[in-house]
Swiss-Prot record:
Binding site for ADP-alpha-D-glucose: K15
GO biological process terms held by the UniProt record: glycogen biosynthetic process
EC number: 2.4.1.21
NCBIfam families for the chain: glgA (TIGR02095), PRK00654.2-3 (NF001904)
Pathway, per record: Glycan biosynthesis; glycogen biosynthesis
Keyword presence, Phosphoprotein: no
GO terms of molecular function: alpha-1,4-glucan glucosyltransferase (ADP-glucose donor) activity; alpha-1,4-glucan glucosyltransferase (UDP-glucose donor) activity
Pfam families xref list: Glyco_transf_5, Glycos_transf_1
Catalytic activity reported: [(1->4)-alpha-D-glucosyl](n) + ADP-alpha-D-glucose = [(1->4)-alpha-D-glucosyl](n+1) + ADP + H(+)
Protein name: Glycogen synthase
Function: Synthesizes alpha-1,4-glucan chains using ADP-glucose.
Native source organism of the sequence: Chlamydia trachomatis serovar L2 (strain ATCC VR-902B / DSM 19102 / 434/Bu)
Gene this protein is translated from: glgA
Length: 474
């Protein structure tokens, strides 16, 4: 089976969030048994094109967007995946000067890229074309209007239903879409506005989200009734498939950044397992200037953005100070106000023996925190899937989550973690923290059962890939 993914992010090359990681994991798992290709735009200022001798092909092609255009497709293989980078030769201003993945004119830029990608797919042929989020939503309409050879199915995955690609009808008219297919993207209440996600929903054969609970939640999203109508119309061709993590990348067995490597097999003698965690904790506390007297260790490894529940993060700081356990927060702030608030907290708590706030993300330090911490807190307002809770469980670190989206699908309260429900209830959140800390301190048998359940949780990529294959073959 030949599968082509179109997206804006792909973690080995460029990423801004979980989409790039999820696509990489899925493509890697599919490539084990199927011809798998990922098509993304080339950002010359953000990553370097592979050397010519490492490329497997260089193709010139034409596409239509705001007139006849020319592009070059550079292809190479990475871990069995064919990666194709598009350079828009006659529209260089769209990507060549971009210093970030996302800018203010994304709808126009991504539609131009989508037009080039669709032209390439029509030329190359594919059995499955798999789109990721609204960014390449135009591809669905273009391929429905003019299918490629051997095309069996167009699949759309919603990594974040909150982002939809609102744009103008004028931009859709710049493509080769005819009036019928433009109408699939058009808003009835405002015919001059088109929504790339809306058209992609109608023009795709199957729609997936990145967790079963998130699939249910988006059917109850009434923030735009026309988008709600579109997703409701597709509900019989909608399925939530939980993302997996690459256990060859994330795991304490071989992680070179740890003070002490360990395996889940050590848990046959729990004391040995916890001794390994303790060695990592000691090394981390020394690095961060924390006191080992404060236990357990709770961490938050997250972007600090409204989606991630920053109001709960502040409550966690107060709770840690009141209850004498360690809290480590690491992540980048999004938004000036949040940055100012957390920078002030960082400064005021710089000499605290049990709280550290680190506002510059480091992959190495994050891995050391995963291994050292006893718990990871993820109080998200919404979470389509979430990967950090699964990574935490791989390291024997118990997740404390708000029961939403993929967090609800992966964490069972009192079984392999702790959870709360109300997105605005500090009392419920603090009770969850207290229950987790008290269990750790006073009920060692229950704590061991919870950690064992974490270590036995299945989060491999192959499970997710097999579920996508079921959809491809339907």
């Amino acid at each position: 089976m030949k599968i082509i993914h179109t997206a804006i992010e792909f973690a080995p090359v460029i990423k801004a969030g979980g989409l790039g990681d999820a696509l990489y994991g899925l493509a890697k798992a599919l490539a084990a048994n199927h011809t798998t290709e990922v098509v993304i735009p080339l950002y010359p200022k953000l990553f370097t094109l592979p050397k010519e001798q490492d490329l497997c092909s260089i193709q010139k092609l034409s596409y239509f967007f705001a007139g006849e255009q020319e592009a070059t497709a550079f292809s190479y293989f990475y871990e069995g995946i064919k990666v194709t980078l598009f350079k828009l030769d006659t529209q260089p201003e769209l990507f060549e000067n971009a210093e970030t993945i996302y800018t203010s004119d994304d709808a126009f830029r991504f539609c131009a890229f989508s037009a080039a990608a669709a032209s390439y797919i029509q030329k190359e042929g594919a059995n499955i074309v798999h789109l990721h989020d609204w960014h390449t939503g135009l591809v669905a309409g273009l391929l429905k209007q003019q299918p490629c050879s051997q095309l069996q199915k167009i699949v759309l995955t919603l990594h974040n239903f909150g982002y939809r690609g609102y744009t103008t009808r004028e931009i859709l008219e710049a493509s080769s879409l005819n009036e019928f297919y433009i109408s699939q993207y058009q808003l009835f209440r405002d015919p001059q506005t088109c929504v790339l996600l809306k058209g992609a929903l109608y023009c795709s054969d199957f729609v997936t989200t990145v967790s079963p609970t998130y699939a249910k939640e988006i059917l109850e999203d009434y923030s735009d009734y026309e988008i709600h109508d579109a997703i409701t119309a597709r509900q019989h061709h909608l399925r939530g498939i939980l993302n997996g993590i690459d256990t060859t990348i994330w795991g304490p067995e071989t992680d070179p950044n740890l003070a002490k490597n360990y395996t889940k097999e050590l848990f046959e003698t729990p004391s040995i397992f916890f001794e390994a965690k303790a060695e990592n904790k000691k090394a981390l506390y020394e690095r961060l200037g924390l006191s080992l007297e404060h236990s357990p260790c709770v961490c938050i490894i997250s972007r600090i953005a409204e989606q991630k529940g920053p109001h709960f993060m502040k409550q966690a700081i107060l709770h840690a100070l009141e209850n004498a356990y360690t809290l480590i927060i690491i992540g980048t702030c999004y938004g000036n106000q949040l940055h100012e608030e957390f920078a002030n907290l960082q400064e005021s708590l710089a000499n605290s023996p049990n709280v550290r706030i680190l506002l510059t993300y480091s992959d190495v330090l994050a891995r050391q925190i995963f291994a050292a911490a006893d718990m990871i807190c993820i109080p998200s307002m919404f979470e389509p899937c979430g990967l950090t809770q699964m990574i935490g469980m791989r390291y024997g670190t118990v997740p404390l989550v708000r029961a939403t989206g993929g967090l609800a699908d992966t964490v069972a309260n009192g079984i392999n973690g702790f959870s709360f429900f109300n997105p605005h209830d500090f009392y419920e959140f603090r009770n969850m923290l207290l229950e987790a800390v008290t269990t750790y301190r006073t009920n060692h048998d229950k704590w061991q059962h919870i950690v064992r359940a974490c270590l036995n949780f299945s989060s491999d990529l192959e499970t997710a890939a097999n579920k996508y294959l079921e959809i491809y073959k339907q």
